[in-house]
Amino acid sequence: MPIRVPLAWLAAAVAVALSPALLLAKGQIEVVAKFQRPNLELDVATYTDPEFESPGNKVGVLGFASGPVRNSFSLRGEDWAQLTDLWAKATRMQSRKQWRTVGTLSERGTAEVSRLTVSAGQGVRLAITSPKGASMAFLVGSAEMARFEAALAQVKDILAK
């Protein structure tokens, strides 16, 4: 069951990513899954803006947080499949010996473009770089891979509605 939380920081970041007109919008964040490390959290979520018509009113979001430092990466439904494809490729490319970059995605429709780099090694690393916030990387370990993949699929389904 999704966790619904009022994450003002994530809503603001997503609103900026979507359009300046959304800055004042009252949207809803639905956190599909949370992944935690001692000093870092990664949320897989959706953001829905009720002021826009469906299906263009939703984006998928990866929200990174380390204490008070936060950043997010968002993709519209038509772009979310690229993330799931990169994820699948990264899970196949894992190696105990070295890290390899699998691919990079960029946000669209914003002046402050965040980039997400997916790498494979001993797990899958998701790294965000952005002019609007701190660069962060989250390592999804083997024990969490199935749950992360399921969260990506759930967001894909939500965005398709």
Spans of model-derived segments:
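Hydrophobic alpha-helical transmembrane segments of integral membrane proteins
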Residues: 2, 16-17
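Positively charged, low-complexity terminal tracts
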Residues: 14, 21-161
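N-terminal regions of proteins, emphasizing targeting and processing segments when present
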Residues: 9, 18-20
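Bacterial N-terminal signal peptides that target proteins for export
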Residues: 1-11
